[in-house]
Regions:
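Active-site catalytic microenvironments in core metabolic enzymes, especially phosphate/sugar-handling
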Residues: 1-237
Length: 237
């Protein structure tokens, strides 16, 4: 496929305007190819991913998490990012990151996780919360709310999530709320900022990863169940 057409196809699925200003979704490395014959898709670029891409003569790696996130002041092969960048350029491998663009996409990570859980009446928060003043609209928390097919206890919901996301039994941390669970809020990755929105929406459970102490304490005080299924656990899907 033509390189230009491939980029256009990716951005039709995960438009760049869905990313906040601080995110670094998009082209990260372009090595001059006009044609891309083989693509490798990954969650993170690691030593193992690069080795596989080299062995399979991959023209592009499409990664969820950006290889280059902050601005680069120098490329130093004594550092992981610099070493990876040099190695990829030397191998002629392009890199594209679909990070929050894919999280917020119509059928991206949040949507797919909701479908795995069998949720109905889905509502995307990103579309419901316009920017205020000069604030970038995409800076606002993104995620999704919806309903389970039936009422569940917190324990039943936890078991359902473990099975649906195919994560280990000890792969979650949980704050048990006061009520049975029907309405859920979720945000893949590190989505603690979405907790307030799920509380306002009347959710009985919030699912995300990388939950901080004060977020867990807030959930307990509000009586909402909270499940930390891990950053990887909510995105390896």
């Amino acid at each position: 496929m033509k390189y230009v057409k491939l980029i256009k196809t990716i951005e039709e699925i995960a438009p760049l305007e869905l990313a906040p200003l601080w995110d670094n979704s998009g082209v990260q490395i372009y090595t001059g190819q006009e044609e891309i014959e083989r693509v490798l898709i990954c969650l993170d670029i690691t030593e193992e991913v690069i080795k596989e891409a080299e062995n399979k003569k991959t023209g592009m790696i499409i990664t969820h998490h950006p290889l280059i996130f902050d601005s680069i002041k120098k490329i130093d092969t004594d550092q992981v990012t610099g070493r990876y960048v040099c190695r990829l350029i030397k191998a002629g491998i392009c890199v594209y990151s679909a990070h929050l663009t894919f999280d917020n996409a119509r059928e991206g990570n949040n949507f797919y996780m909701a479908k795995l859980l069998g949720m109905e009446n889905l509502k995307t928060a990103a579309k419901e919360r316009p920017g205020e003043g000069s604030k970038d609209p995409a800076e606002l928390p993104s995620g999704m709310t919806g309903q389970l097919c039936r009422q569940m206890t917190p324990e039943e919901a936890a078991s359902h999530i473990i099975n649906a996301l195919e994560i280990p039994q000890d792969g979650i941390r949980m704050v048990k709320g006061k009520n049975t669970i029907k309405k859920i809020g979720l945000c893949t990755g590190a989505g603690g900022d979405f907790l307030d929105y799920t509380i306002r929406e009347g959710c009985e459970l919030f699912i995300t990863g990388d939950v901080k102490l004060h977020e867990a304490q807030r959930a307990k005080a509000e009586g909402i169940s909270l499940i930390d299924a891990g950053h990887y656990g909510t995105e390896h899907i």
